[in-house]
C-alpha cells in the first residue's frame, strides 16, 4: 500500500536531484555517499526529534529503507 505524503512529488524529486548533484559534483563514491547521508539522518533525528521519539523514528526510517530496497541484481 503506497504511503500518502504531505509533500508533492515535485518537492521530493527536486530535493533528491539537488542532493544527488552535490554528491556527484564531489565525485563521492557509494560508501562515502552512504556515510554522509547516514550522518545527515542521524543529525536530523538528534537535532529535530524529541529524545523520547528518536528510537521509534530511527526504527521506522530503517524499516522504510529496507522495504524500499530492490533485490533485483540489475542496476
Curated annotation (Swiss-Prot):
Matches recorded under InterPro entries: UPF0352 (IPR009857), YejL_sf (IPR023202)
SUPFAM superfamilies: YejL-like (SSF158651)
Highest taxon in the source lineage: Bacteria
Pfam families in the cross-refs: DUF1414 (PF07208)
NCBIfam families: PRK13689.1
Family: Belongs to the UPF0352 family.
Protein name: UPF0352 protein KPN78578_25810
Species this chain originates from: Klebsiella pneumoniae subsp. pneumoniae (strain ATCC 700721 / MGH 78578)
Amino acid at each position: 500500500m503506497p504511503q500518502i505524503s504531505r509533500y508533492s512529488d515535485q518537492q521530493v524529486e527536486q530535493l533528491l536531484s539537488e542532493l544527488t548533484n552535490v554528491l556527484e559534483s564531489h565525485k563521492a563514491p557509494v560508501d562515502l555517499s552512504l556515510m554522509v547521508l547516514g550522518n545527515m539522518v542521524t543529525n536530523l533525528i538528534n537535532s529535530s526529534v524529541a529524545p523520547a521519539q528518536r528510537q521509534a523514528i530511527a526504527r521506522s526510517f530503517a524499516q522504510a529503507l529496507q522495504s524500499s530496497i530492490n533485490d533485483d541484481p540489475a542496476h
